[in-house]
């Protein structure tokens, strides 16, 4: 006969788990074959939950080494410089012409990732099989590879005395109400003129959020505030994005690289530290061979150390590709000090680079 037990105290140990998927389409794949160890690298990506950790995928169309020369090799690579390793499981598959998953292979265990270390499958798919079924696996000469990553976070204990009931967010958030004031120009008391476009706003909100606007309003005469305040050297769309952040704390269009590039100087000029950080994060996520040089110049100009470090690391990692761009060739004369810093970063990367680790995968039926 079982007996109910009464516990005077209790607790739990939990581990956070983060999951995300990334889809990568390689166009004109038949022209990317190259030789053994010739690789193709994806754009840098990260999860929505953790923008600090950057990843990329690598594909070796003719294998990562002589042993895999008849296979397609695929890898997941950790790019971020972190103080501790990242433990993660991952799964690769191909999307065929019917939109179906093909050749699903997953890591057999949780793997340890260090900076610049790659884990994956050097014998992911026989190349002859891929080419003989090109209509199905390479529609319009495009290879679409997907990777699902499961990151194991830190374990933490939850004693009973520390657990409190969750409080739901109120239905109408303060930011929504302030956003309505901005969108509908309700009860405004000032007008800002940007490239011929008038924007109605509230001095109190602008002064509370931006030290530059605060100083502007403190030193302006009452009579002059009756006329529109001219805002120079700003695009109306960029100004609108900045004002939306001032009122709501949100900047929904920073996923656009050009928008993030334009908003960053505005955030710096008007003392919007949080918006500046959001721009940094967005630009770090969108680094590419084409824009890395301009991003480095921008980061240096506006003293964004995190973005500058990421740009230097990216340039060091893709040095041969970046050096072929017209943007890089122009920086040799315009910003020689940045070229010197890039070479220092490249030298450090060469010294700390770790040999890739390969794990053998198994087909998942």
Swiss-Prot record:
Annotated ranges, domain BTB: 188-250
Q: Where is the signal peptide?
A: none
Residue intervals of the MATH domain: 19-149
What SMART domains is this protein classified in?
Answer: BTB, MATH
PROSITE patterns cross-referenced by the UniProt entry: BTB, MATH
Q: Which domain of life, per UniProt?
A: Eukaryota
Q: Which PANTHER family match?
A: SPECKLE-TYPE POZ PROTEIN
Q: Which family does it belong to?
A: Belongs to the Tdpoz family.
Q: What is this protein called?
A: TD and POZ domain-containing protein 1
**Which organism is the protein's source?**
Mus musculus (Mouse)
Q: What is the lineage of its organism?
A: Eukaryota, Metazoa, Chordata, Craniata, Vertebrata
């Amino acid at each position: 006969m079982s007996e109910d037990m009464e516990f005077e105290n209790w607790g739990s140990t939990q581990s956070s788990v983060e999951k995300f998927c990334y889809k990568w389409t390689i166009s004109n794949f038949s022209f990317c074959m190259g030789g053994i160890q010739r690789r193709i690298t994806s754009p840098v990506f990260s999860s929505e939950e953790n923008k600090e950790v950057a990843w990329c995928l690598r594909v070796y169309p003719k294998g990562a080494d002589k042993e895999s020369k008849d296979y397609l090799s695929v890898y997941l690579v950790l790019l971020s410089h972190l103080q501790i390793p990242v433990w993660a499981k991952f799964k690769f598959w191909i999307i065929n012409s019917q939109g179906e998953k093909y050749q699903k292979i997953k890591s057999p265990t949780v793997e340890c990732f260090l900076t610049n270390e790659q884990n994956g499958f050097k014998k992911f798919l026989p190349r002859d099989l891929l080419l003989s079924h090109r209509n199905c696996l390479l529609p319009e000469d495009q290879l679409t590879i997907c990777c699902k990553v499961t990151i194991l976070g830190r374990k933490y204990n939850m004693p009973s005395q520390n657990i409190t009931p969750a409080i739901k967010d109120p239905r109408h958030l303060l930011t929504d109400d302030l956003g309505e004031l901005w969108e509908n120009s309700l009860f405004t008391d000032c007008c800002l003129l940007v490239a011929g476009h008038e924007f109605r706003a509230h001095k109190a909100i602008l002064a509370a959020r931006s030290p530059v606007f605060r100083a502007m309003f403190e030193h302006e005469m009452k009579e002059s505030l009756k006329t529109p305040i001219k805002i120079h050297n700003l695009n109306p769309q960029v100004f609108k994005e900045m004002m939306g952040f001032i009122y709501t704390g949100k900047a929904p269009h920073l996923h656009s690289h050009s928008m993030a590039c334009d908003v960053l100087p505005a955030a710096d000029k008007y003392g919007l530290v949080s918006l500046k950080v959001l721009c940094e994060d967005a630009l770090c996520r969108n680094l590419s061979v084409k824009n890395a040089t301009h991003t480095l110049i921008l980061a240096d100009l506006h003293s964004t150390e995190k973005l500058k470090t990421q740009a230097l690391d990216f340039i060091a990692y893709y040095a041969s590709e970046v050096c072929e761009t017209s943007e890089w060739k122009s920086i040799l004369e315009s910003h020689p000090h940045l070229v010197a810093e890039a070479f220092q970063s490249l030298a450090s990367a060469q010294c700390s680079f770790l040999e890739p680790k390969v794990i053998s995968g198994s087909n998942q039926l």
